[in-house]
């Protein structure tokens, strides 16, 4: 196990909101691709296993906020997550400002954009 910095449970099981249909989400922190594939081969389809460092930032933040440590030192993991929390703080406002209120709004703006693009480019 020393090839893995941390193993976290996240998602519905970590929040204690799981149902019969819920999968078990496991996140490997500080693991190389070969070790990941080795673990995946041993566990098969029992778990949904992801590499923390390869996930989108918003999912990383959800994991940081709502996880349970299966393996690893909580303090060391917290220190490891510091840089991701800092990046999120720096980007959160821009990310939130670029969200749409609804799918309808997104589609409407996309159509307006495409119409303008067509008008300009011909």
From Swiss-Prot:
Entry's cofactor comment: Binds 2 Mg(2+) ions.
This protein's cofactor list reads: Mg(2+)
Which principal EC class is assigned to this enzyme? transferase
Q: Where does Mg(2+) 1 bind?
A: 23, 25, 48
Q: Which reaction does it catalyse?
A: L-tyrosyl-[protein] + ATP = O-(5'-adenylyl)-L-tyrosyl-[protein] + diphosphate; O-(5'-adenylyl)-L-tyrosyl-[protein] + ATP = O-[5'-(adenylyl-(5'->3')-adenylyl)]-L-tyrosyl-[protein] + diphosphate
Molecular-function GO term, any one: nucleotidyltransferase activity
Q: Which UniProt keywords apply?
A: ATP-binding, Magnesium, Metal-binding, Nucleotide-binding, Nucleotidyltransferase, Toxin-antitoxin system, Transferase
Task: Pinpoint motif GSX(10)DXD motif by residue range.
Answer: 11-25
Signal peptide per UniProt? none
Q: Which domain of life is it from?
A: Archaea
Q: Which residues bind Mg(2+) 2?
A: 23, 25
UniProt cross-references to InterPro entries, sorted A to Z: NT_sf (IPR043519), Polbeta (IPR041633)
Q: Name one Pfam family in it.
A: Polbeta
List its EC numbers. Answer: 2.7.7.108
Entry function: Probable antitoxin component of a putative type VII toxin-antitoxin (TA) system. Neutralizes cognate toxic MJ1548 by di-AMPylation.
Summarize subunit and interaction data from the UniProt record for this chain.
Probably forms a complex with cognate toxin MJ1548.
Q: Which family does it belong to?
A: Belongs to the MntA antitoxin family.
What is the protein's name according to its record?
A: Putative protein adenylyltransferase MJ1547
Q: What is the lineage of its organism?
A: Archaea, Methanobacteriati, Methanobacteriota, Methanomada group, Methanococci
